[in-house]
Amino acid sequence: MRKLIRRADVLVQNFRPGTMERLGLSEAALRAENPRLIYVSISGVGERGPYAKKRVYDPIIQGLSGFADLQADPETRRPRMIRTIVADKTTAIFAAQAVTAALFARERTGEG
């Protein structure tokens, strides 16, 4: 892994907060080996807070965000999930846009 990191442009990880640190692969540790590395960390509900260490999946995000309620059955008002992984897909789109912006910034500054 370290050999790959030295030559990598981008690293994307979506472990629960603290996992990469326990593996010795924190952002700081990897940047020390490759200052140009773009380090993308995706977590379900952020790095801190009451849910930070919880496992989070698309249906959970749909429920917590109120999205399932927006799709509720009109008669029973029972929440319904969208039948696609909308939160996962949206996260991927935003992450890709962030990587593109970070690569552009790196070309100007030399740092990831």
Place the predicted regions along the sequence by residue.
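A structured beta-alpha segment of the ubiquitous adenosine-cofactor-binding alpha/beta core
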Residues: M1-A32
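Active-site-adjacent "lid/gating" segments in soluble enzymes
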Residues: E21-G112
